[in-house]
Amino acid sequence: MKELKVSAINKGTVIDHIPSGKGLKVLEILNLPEDNTILVAINVKSQKLGRKDIIKVEGKILNEDEVNKIALIAPTATVNIIDKWEVVEKRNVEVPDEIVGIIKCANPNCITNYEEVKPKFKVISKKPLKLKCHYCERTMEENMVVKNLL
């Protein structure tokens, strides 16, 4: 018999297969409203990852920008949409080829940091993560990308 360590949700989103230790960062970048019930499991056993984190958000379906942010921090994550206690959609997150408006450029002289221009990055490499600013051509690696998520 399977043991459920984190209670099920009626309607919302489950973010599963987050690498162990990255769940709180995922939660932080999602900036969820206080009225959502949020369940977090950290460092639970996983056949796929050995250990993983899980986040369940009652009453919230993630938008594309939120899923893209998760992909930058936790590329092994899966996003499950729940309705009436059942998984109605399941998808693996994927780093897109181009990222617009969710990361601030690390170059203080970049036009995106002083004009009303949405930051835009081309993904040079997904593993390891490396992005290049469309405007100033500054490259950023994973640790800098995570620090500059909007």
UniProtKB/Swiss-Prot annotation:
Binding positions for Zn(2+) per the UniProt entry: 105, 110, 133, 136
Signal peptide: none
A Pfam family: PyrI_C
Record-level GO cellular component terms: aspartate carbamoyltransferase complex
Cofactor(s) it depends on: Zn(2+)
Keywords, comma-separated and alphabetical: Metal-binding, Pyrimidine biosynthesis, Zinc
InterPro entries named in the record: Asp_carbamoyltransf_reg_N, Asp_carbamoylTrfase_reg, Asp_carbamoyltrfase_reg_C, Asp_carbatrfase_reg_C_sf, Asp_carbatrfase_reg_N_sf
Quaternary context: Contains catalytic and regulatory chains.
Family: Belongs to the PyrI family.
This protein's name: Aspartate carbamoyltransferase regulatory chain
Species the sequence originates in: Thermococcus sibiricus (strain DSM 12597 / MM 739)
